[in-house]
Amino acid sequence: MLDTIKQFLKEHEIDEKAGFIIAVSGGADSITLLHAFKYLNLRIYALHCNFNLRGKESNMDEQFVKRFCETYGIPMSVKHFDTQEYAKQKGISIEMAARELRYEWFEEMRQKKKMDYIVVGHHADDLAETLFINICRGTGIKGLTGIRPVKDRILRPLLSRSREEIIAYIEQNQLGYRTDSTNNSLDYVRNKI
């Protein structure tokens, strides 16, 4: 995993002295990213979004991320969102509301903390799901590209790795992670796949 990240930075000509905002949900992919970037001694700042959608579970995710960052000496911030109210006001889905809220905050914090990039934990399985969803929606050629590894200031260094490889890294390094119960809910398009 460390080699994957080093290769990604080299391939995309990203200076290792740059500053990286790491988006951390507490799931296996984001914990892998956070641990690997810390291990590589890169300049990082962790951000965790509490969307207040899963009651105690959301708060437990937040506490887990705080403890992880404290253990590894990683500076971090948390922001609470009223995602349901935002979705209602905008007339959009909860998924879209959470996406808009988090990326707006990530960019705001990137500038405030004088960092260069926002790093998110999308992996190969996410890429395959996105392509499938786009095909089902009758996408054009543009939609067949799926998730790009670099878009503006957003980096996705794990796109070449499967969830299985990410879990192996977690186990090898004896790292914990949280599982979002909504991943099992058929209320979200991605989960129906």
Residues of each region from the PLM?
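Core alpha/beta nucleotide-donor-binding catalytic domains of modification enzymes
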Residues: 1-193
